[in-house]
């Protein structure tokens, strides 16, 4: 497992204008790969991701787990409880979790791990952003917008009011036994970028 530091674009900011490079996600999106790929975005729909995947073979599923959390759904953390079974007929090659893992407890992380393993292709990769600094985070998951330069704009959904779990790589592997941490990258906006593979 490798660990490095990436530099944000422009001045530091905790508001809607915070833009940050996400090298591990950029690698997934720019990989020279002519294979048909199925992507599953566990966040809300956003045009930037669709634009970056445009022209590539495959398709994109959007589960919108943040909306399920806001709506109070009991199993909001399970994408196959949000999208009916017909959406999961093909194995998924890439799962995008954004900051959602920060909002799950150990049991929920374990259930998500099983779900991703059940629907993932053999060479599946799972991307996530984990808060590693600060004691408080926004009450609900942030909104992310990916621009043409493969940088993220992070739009917090409200004031900080929730304790930050600050999951370590070892803690995540323990809670998510179906996944293994392959690479991590510290981002200077207080997040750590993670790339997981299936065990």
Language-model-detected regions and their locations in the chain:
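Short, glycine/acidic-rich beta->alpha junctions
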Residues: 44-45, 108
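Conserved residues at beta->alpha junctions
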Residues: 43-44, 100
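A short SAM/SAH-binding and catalytic strip from SAM-dependent methyltransferases
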Residues: 90-110
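Class I (Rossmann-like) S-adenosyl-L-methionine-dependent methyltransferase catalytic domain
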Residues: 1-31, 37-39, 45-86, 125-199
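Periplasmic/luminal catalytic loop of GT-C fold multi-pass membrane glycosyltransferases
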Residues: 82-86, 92, 115
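Generic secondary-structure microfeatures
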Residues: 99, 108, 120, 130-132
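A short glycine-rich, Lys/Arg-flanked "PGG" loop and its adjoining helix->strand segment in the class I
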Residues: 110-125
């Amino acid at each position: 497992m490798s660990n490095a530091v990436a530099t944000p674009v422009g001045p530091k900011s905790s508001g809607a204008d915070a833009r940050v490079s996400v090298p591990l996600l950029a690698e997934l999106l720019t990989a020279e790969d002519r294979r048909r790929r199925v992507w599953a975005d566990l966040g809300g729909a956003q045009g930037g991701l669709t634009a970056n995947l445009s022209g590539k073979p495959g398709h994109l599923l959007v589960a919108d787990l943040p909306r399920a959390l806001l709506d109070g759904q009991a199993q909001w953390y399970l994408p196959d409880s949000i999208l009916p079974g017909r959406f999961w007929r093909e194995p998924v090659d890439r799962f995008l979790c954004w900051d959602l893992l920060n909002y799950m407890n150990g049991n929920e992380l374990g259930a998500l791990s099983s779900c991703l393993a059940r629907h993932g292709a053999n060479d599946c990769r799972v991307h996530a952003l984990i808060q590693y600094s600060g004691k408080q985070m926004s009450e609900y998951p942030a909104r992310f917008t990916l621009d043409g330069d493969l940088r993220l704009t992070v739009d917090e959904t409200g004031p900080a009011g929730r304790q930050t779990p600050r999951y370590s790589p070892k803690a995540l592997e323990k809670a998510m036994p179906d996944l293994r941490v392959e690479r991590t990258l510290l981002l200077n906006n207080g997040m750590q970028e993670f790339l997981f593979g299936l065990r």
